[in-house]
């Protein structure tokens, strides 16, 4: 399979259209999630990061594979990365969603990451309301690893968004 390393805005919207067919809760995360919070694309993106209701893991994987995706990294139950010959990469992260809006995600050591309800929100991008990780959640999710240049870029935007929120 030829692997494309860039997800365009049109590709992102196609992936989100596919996610919408499930009727499940999901949130855009990662670099595209930051750009959606800002309301415009600010850099190139290698993948689309999606956090989703873990109860749909098997159905989501079957659908992605039937649409031409191929699993490239399988770290279940933490994350699964898939590649599509035209739409590039999608990195899916199963979340256990609690009734109070909080959630948790398995970690690689057999434990859990716990997430507050206000980490989950939405933003308008290209005239469309997209469920995404909030700026507060993005700030937390951008911890615990060494930053690449794209992460530093995203953090500057997250800090800008958080400072704009605090001045409101």
Predicted region positions:
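Active-site nucleotide-donor binding segment shared across nucleotidyl transfer reactions
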Residues: 16-48, 53, 59, 134
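A short alpha/beta connector and helix-capping loop motif
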Residues: 61-69
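Helical scaffold of the NTase/Pol beta-like nucleotidyltransferase catalytic core
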Residues: 1-28, 156, 160-168
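Catalytic cores of NTP-dependent nucleotidyl/adenyl transfer enzymes across multiple folds
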Residues: 105-168
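Conserved catalytic core of two-metal-ion nucleotidyltransferases
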Residues: 69-103
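Short, solvent-exposed loop/turn segments at secondary-structure junctions
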Residues: 33-34, 97-98, 137-139
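Short, conserved charged micro-motifs
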Residues: 56-62, 103
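Anion (oxyanion) recognition and catalysis
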Residues: 20, 65, 124
């Amino acid at each position: 399979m030829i692997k494309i390393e860039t997800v365009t805005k049109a590709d992102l919207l196609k992936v989100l259209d596919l996610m919408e067919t499930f009727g499940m809760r999901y949130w855009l995360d990662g670099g595209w999630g930051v750009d959606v919070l800002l309301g415009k694309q600010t850099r190139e993106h290698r993948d689309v990061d999606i956090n989703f209701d873990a109860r749909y893991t098997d159905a989501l994987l079957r659908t992605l594979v039937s649409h031409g995706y191929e699993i490239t990294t399988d770290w279940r139950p933490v994350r699964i990365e898939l590649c599509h010959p035209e739409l590039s990469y999608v990195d899916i992260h199963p979340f256990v969603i609690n009734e109070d809006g909080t959630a948790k995600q398995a970690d690689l050591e057999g434990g859990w990451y716990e997430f507050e309800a206000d980490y989950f929100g939405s933003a308008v991008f290209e005239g469309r309301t997209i469920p995404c990780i909030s700026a507060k959640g993005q700030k937390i999710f951008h911890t615990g690893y060494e930053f690449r240049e794209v992460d530093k870029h995203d953090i500057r935007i997250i800090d800008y968004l958080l400072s704009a929120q605090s001045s409101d």
